[in-house]
Amino acid sequence: MSVISMVLVVIVAFLAGMEGVLDEFQFHQPLVACTLIGLVTGQLVPCIILGGSLQMIALGWANIGAAVAPDAALAAVASAIILVQGGQGRAGVDTAIAVAIPLAVAGLFLTMIVRTLSVICVHQMDAAAAKGSFKGVEAWHIIAVCLQGIRIAIPAAALLAIPSSAVAAALNSMPAWLTDGMSIGGGMVVAVGYAMVINM
């Protein structure tokens, strides 16, 4: 992958992280995030297939009360990077789907860290508001939103730092029973996600 493609992938990851809280342009949705990553890396078709499958899973995820849903943005971005770096094309989609689920759950840890840091930003906004500083309030708002973007951009950059040959070797070294199991499990998770939406 070229340096320009890597930079563009990190930008997509940053936008996906910000959109996780802004919800304006939907960059955090798996279908959009994976498609954009596929577009900038030249792997459009496999990434659209991956994004569509992950979207079916994420449709059933929702924040309810204090319970936070798994991180769809991190799952989409990280699994798309693994798919592209693995170089397996459409054949690697099922493995990428299976990898996305634990990544989504792991993303909750990063979400909690960033939301805790955002509390500091809120206190700074309050202090700026007490002084009548509109620019101060605006600056702290931007910082808080950028923290959400960094939450996805840093793991994306870390994955891109791993040589594609190492990712491909790791994926190719998996035994057939494991890849077949991941393929079946990935398909079941998509079906369960869609079934949850139908039941709503």
PLM segments and residue spans:
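Short helix-perturbing small/polar motifs within transmembrane alpha-helices
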Residues: 8-17, 59-62, 74-120, 130
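Alpha-helical transmembrane anchor segments
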Residues: 188-200
